[in-house]
Amino acid sequence: MPNAAASPRYVNNGDGTLTDLQTCLMWEMKTGTVGSPVDCSTTTCSNPHDVNNLYHWCSGFPNCTNASNPPDGGAFTDFLQRVNGQLCATGTCPDLGGYSDWRVPTLAELQTIVDFTQGVCGGGSGPCINPAFGPTQADNHWSASTNAGTPAQAWLVNFNFGGASSNNKALVAYVRAVRGGF
């Protein structure tokens, strides 16, 4: 019988996606080289997979303070439309991995990819995530989860130390798309 410990948790699908065999979630892999952040609300970010792209959770007040308003910031509009092949100038839009049901992960889903044996968390340097995910900014990444106690805030995971916190939805953070569910 094969050694279960030797089985990989993550499978690179060869199409810019990674499947987590433990949770059955499929994740977007980022591209490029970690560098200076790019605020996609002030410039066009045509490559949604660029590791340096920052997005807003909501477009601003009053949407950010009303829990009943749907998320309408660049993370949920421009980013997801591009990942899902819905926003392009040519009319032939590639969707990621052949799927068009990508979304921003919940807090619980995003926390599943924090790896406390990697990067700063493991005593080294870099982000606390398995290198199989490709380049990752060691900073805050949005989840789709609103802070129930403070509706103007949403939950983020910081891959510099692996922790979660909530912050103002009008701020910018990084985003990694996911599909499926557990």
Labelled PLM ranges:
Residues 1-103, 107-182:
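Glycine-aromatic-enriched surface loops/turns that form tight recognition elements
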